[in-house]
A protein has these predicted regions:
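Conserved cytochrome P450 K-helix/beta-meander segment immediately N-terminal to the heme-binding cysteine loop
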Residues: 359-387, 467
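Cytochrome P450 proximal C-terminal region
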Residues: 1, 7-8, 39, 127, ...
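Cytochrome P450 catalytic-core helices
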Residues: 273-292, 296-298, 409-424
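Cytochrome P450 heme-thiolate monooxygenase catalytic core
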Residues: 1-11, 76-81, 115-276, 294
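Cytochrome P450 I-helix active-site segment
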Residues: 10-14, 120-124, 175-181, 232-240, ...
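Conserved cytochrome P450 K-helix E-x-x-R motif and the immediately C-terminal K′/meander segment
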Residues: 22-42, 218, 222, 306-347
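N-terminal membrane-proximal hinge/A-helix region immediately C-terminal to the signal-anchor transmembrane segment
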Residues: 1-102, 122-129, 204, 212, ...
């Protein structure tokens, strides 16, 4: 391996027993610390030491078969469904079979390309407001939490595009803190279930965690009620499209509780996963500022008065490659647990009924067989001329097949917009003496908040005025 390559933070691999004891003692629920070194090299292997230990599949063809699940043999595990139930109920994130198909069929039209182009105007408005806030930090020189800033920004984007309303900073902070508490609790349940207990373990959450879930659902319910209590046609957003959706067989819409489940998972998954990805993007830019010049060279010609048009998001191959490489190294959803409903064999591996099966974008996307310099940050691998040579099925940050994330296109456009806005305007600096380690809970975030300062970009590096285009407002 080239010694000059940049290797972003990753947990050290420890022997299984030591890693388990350490994780349970720390109580932070970091599943990445349980991965043995061989998990980045084997095709199929076990996590844990018991007969019922979790089976990890790293072979793309096996991953595809499990995720497509044409025979209905690998539903989402009760471990995951039970842990998430207090927050997202029976949303399509946890359902399977006919119920999932009904939900997906009703929801898909809300994320059509047409609606994405319409939503882009709201994305721009939210981003502009948060650029102003970050600019104030640059003026004062005060450090801020990168994680919290990205969570607030992406939550505001989701609120404006899904519900047509900005998100108050105090609500964003409360949701961030409550969700952090919730995902730490879920990760602890996952560790016990994956390593020590059968896959069908009963899931119990503490009163504190249940109260956090109730507060989050209260905020989402209030947003849903605002739409339900107005004249049809007042809003032209994702929430209104989902509210108006009808079951093709019964002609019935979603109930209020179903709307809170479905729109709640849009809000939570839609902003937390993107916030996770962008936190790593700007962490890496602070670590490797030479990339700022390269990205600015591509972004600047498409900026107009500090804005980026919707069409321009399709013309940023290097910026897109940078984002994709950050997603490869830090996939927002680190692990996807399934359970075998019956005895089954997958590519030579026999699984007993009840076996917990794990698909891990984290290990698949860092696997030594499919990636050159797998732990190194090399965005060039995702440039159009190189991407065609990548192993098919080894890159799944948004899932694949019928369960491909419904908001994948939304997240990519949003991220390119935010990257372009901030990269074109600011320089980034990490506060010294921070130990940044990724933690896998529900999303892949730094174990502790990352503190950062920003400075205004020097005017000499501003966009060439003769290359400026206008923002598309569609």
């Amino acid at each position: 391996m080239d010694e000059t390559l940049y290797i972003p933070p990753k947990p050290n691999s420890l022997p299984a027993v030591i890693a388990l004891i350490r994780s349970l003692w720390k109580g932070d629920g970091n599943l990445l610390e349980l991965l043995p070194a061989e998990a980045y090299h084997f095709d199929i292997g076990h996590l844990g030491r018991s007969r019922r230990g979790t089976v990890l599949f790293n072979r793309p063809s096996a991953v595809k078969e499990i995720m497509r699940d044409e025979q209905g043999v690998f539903p989402k595990s009760d471990l995951m469904v039970g842990a998430l139930d207090p927050l997202i109920g029976e949303s399509m994130f946890v359902t399977d079979g006919p119920k999932w198909r009904r939900q997906r069929t009703m929801i898909d039209p809300a994320f059509s390309l047409m609606r994405l182009s319409v939503a882009y105007v709201a994305m721009c408005a939210a981003t502009d407001d948060h650029v102003s806030t970050i600019s104030e930090s640059a003026d004062s020189g005060q450090p801020f939490s990168l994680d919290l800033a990205m969570s607030h920004l992406t939550a505001d984007v989701i609120c404006r595009t899904v519900f047509s309303t900005p998100l108050a900073s105090n609500v964003a902070k409360e949701v961030f803190e409550d969700f952090t508490l919730f995902e730490k609790s879920v990760a602890q349940v996952d560790i016990l279930g994956m390593i020590l207990k059968p896959a069908w373990s009963e899931i119990k959450q503490t009163r504190e965690v249940l109260a956090a879930c109730e507060r989050i659902r209260y905020h989402i319910g209030a947003l849903v009620d605002t739409h339900l209590n107005v004249t049809e046609g007042k809003f032209n957003d994702i929430a209104s499209a989902v509210i108006q959706a009808k079951d093709k067989d019964t002609g019935l819409p979603f109930t209020r509780d179903e709307l809170i489940d479905q729109l709640g998972v849009f809000f939570l998954a839609g902003h937390e996963t993107t916030a996770s990805a962008l936190t790593w993007v700007f962490y890496i830019l602070a670590e490797r500022p030479e990339w700022l010049a390269r990205l600015r060279e591509e972004i600047d010609p498409y900026m107009s008065d500090g804005d980026l048009s919707f069409e321009a998001t399709k013309k940023l191959p290097l910026t897109r490659a940078f984002f994709k490489e950050a997603l490869r190294l830090y996939p927002p959803i680190t692990f996807v647990p399934r359970v075998a409903l019956e005895k089954v064999e997958i590519e030579g591996k026999r699984l007993p009924r009840g076996a917990l099966v794990m698909i891990a974008p984290w290990t698949l996307q860092r696997h030594s067989k499919y990636w050159e310099d797998p732990h190194a940050f090399k965005p060039e691998r995702f440039l159009p001329e190189n991407e065609k040579n990548l192993t098919q099925g080894a890159y799944i940050p948004f899932g694949q097949g019928p369960h491909l994330c419904v908001g994948a296109g939304f997240a990519q456009v949003e991220s390119l917009l935010i990257m372009s806005q901030l990269v074109s305007k600011f320089d980034f600096e990490l506060l010294p003496n921070q130990r940044v380690v990724p933690a896998a809970r529900l999303t892949t975030r730094p174990a502790e908040q990352v503190m950062m300062r920003v400075r205004h970009r020097a005017q000499s590096n501003a966009a060439p005025t003769h290359l400026i285009t206008s923002r598309q407002t569609v």
